[in-house]
Curated annotation (Swiss-Prot):
Residues 264-315 form the SOCS box domain. GO terms for molecular function: ubiquitin-like ligase-substrate adaptor activity. SUPFAM superfamilies: Concanavalin A-like lectins/glucanases. Residues 85-274 form the B30.2/SPRY domain. Substrate-recognition component of the ECS(SPSB3) complex, composed of SPSB3, CUL5, ELOB, ELOC and RNF7/RBX2. Interacts with MET. This is SPRY domain-containing SOCS box protein 3. Pathway: Protein modification; protein ubiquitination. One of its GO terms (cellular component) is Cul5-RING ubiquitin ligase complex. Keywords: Nucleus, Ubl conjugation pathway. Residues 37-56, 327-355 are annotated as: Disordered. It comes from the Eukaryota. Disulfide bonds: none annotated.
Length: 355
């Protein structure tokens, strides 16, 4: 087959039409007539955009992921059957998993893409308020240096489209670089790591099968341990696995990105602690009692000490340290990847344990 010219604008419009047709079929299957979702048929201004060398995205990418919510609240699994994306989450403000009142950091209003809007004291970020023409991203207000850092991101809207991701990145990541390109922004280079809602882990442009998919209502936890140099992901407060190692002496920002129109995410927890003997003891206690609702319950400790530990290290005492069985990779997510990129391979993950 003859190879088409890379910079042909005619091909851009041909592929745009094909993508619009694929998206229209996807909406018909989803039972929706007025979706404002991230359609890869939106035209990009980039002539040399490598994303246009792919085939039209698979139909399921336009259908929100359901059945992966942290709770059973009404509205967390109905998005794909609503007639409008706006009505899908209007009036259904679920607060499950949002117990914390103090936050170590929130989203940074000065370091974000133009297609983002902050609310809820800068803890909630909304992407592409009307329609989407690319990828929007944002980072936290605090650079994460030495110590233990843990945060949770709740998916507060339908999760669908080219990609919605949670991860970390250095200050070198350009958050507005792909504002006219639909892509998986986090993990495209060596400066960032990103977990996609499809279950793929991205880093240096490589993709590995890492977890099951997540959707509206899912809570994605991230633990950056600069003492051991590890990055660990959690889903609905269950450990998925260690995504990266050898991260000592590096500094990162928490980041998220989305290509989906009218999508949103919310910081429900952001904590930090020094790597002290107190932290290591609490972490070890949690490992020894992984299924206990209250790790300190029944232990011969003074009530005052228990309260202090809960206030300072409650996130450690509630953290799941047992790794779930690795799920089977989603073949639909793999087929929508860039054909010239490497195929997703099984991720060799370490157990969520500390020595």
């Amino acid at each position: 087959m003859a190879r088409r010219p890379r910079n042909s604008r005619a091909w851009h419009f041909v592929l745009s039409a094909a993508r619009r047709d694929a998206d229209a079929r996807a909406v018909a299957l989803a039972g929706s007539t007025n979706w404002g979702y991230d359609s890869d048929g939106q035209h990009s201004d980039s002539d040399s955009d490598p994303e246009y060398s792919t085939l039209p995205p698979s139909i399921p990418s336009a259908v929100p992921v359901t059945g992966e919510s942290f709770c059973d609240c009404a509205g967390q699994s109905e998005a794909s059957f609503c007639s409008s994306l706006h009505s899908a989450h209007r009036g259904r403000d679920c607060r499950c998993g949002e117990e914390d009142e103090y936050f170590d950091w929130v989203w940074d209003d000065l370091n974000k893409s133009s297609a983002t809007l902050l609310s809820c004291d800068n803890r909630k970020v909304s992407f592409h308020m009307e329609y989407s023409c690319g990828t929007a991203a944002i980072r936290g207000t605090k650079e994460l240096g030495e110590g233990q850092h843990f945060w949770e991101i709740k998916m507060t809207s339908p999760v669908y489209g080219t990609d919605m991701m949670v991860g970390i990145g250095t200050s070198d990541v350009d958050l507005d670089k792909y504002r006219h390109t639909f892509c998986s922004l986090l993990g495209r280079d060596e400066d960032s790591w990103g977990l996609s809602y499809t279950g793929l882990l991205h880093h240096k442009g490589d993709k590995t099968s890492f977890s099951s998919r997540f959707g509206q209502g899912s809570i994605i936890g991230v633990h950056l341990d600069t003492w051991h140099g590890t990055l660990t992901f959690f889903k609905n407060r269950k450990c998925i696995g260690v995504a990266a190692t050898k991260l000592q002496n590096k500094r990162f920002y928490p980041m998220v990105c989305s290509t989906a129109a009218r999508s949103s995410m919310k910081v429900t927890r952001s904590c930090a602690s020094a790597t002290s003997l107190q932290y290591l003891c609490c972490h070890r206690l949690r490992q020894l009692r992984p299924d206990s609702g209250d790790t300190l319950e029944g232990l011969p400790l003074p009530p005052g000490l228990k309260q202090v530990l809960h206030n300072k290290l409650g996130w450690v005492l509630s953290m799941s340290c047992s790794r779930r069985k690795a799920p089977v990779s989603d073949p639909q997510a793999a087929t929508s990847a860039h054909p010239s990129s490497r195929e997703p391979r099984p991720c060799q993950r370490k157990r969520c344990r500390r020595t």
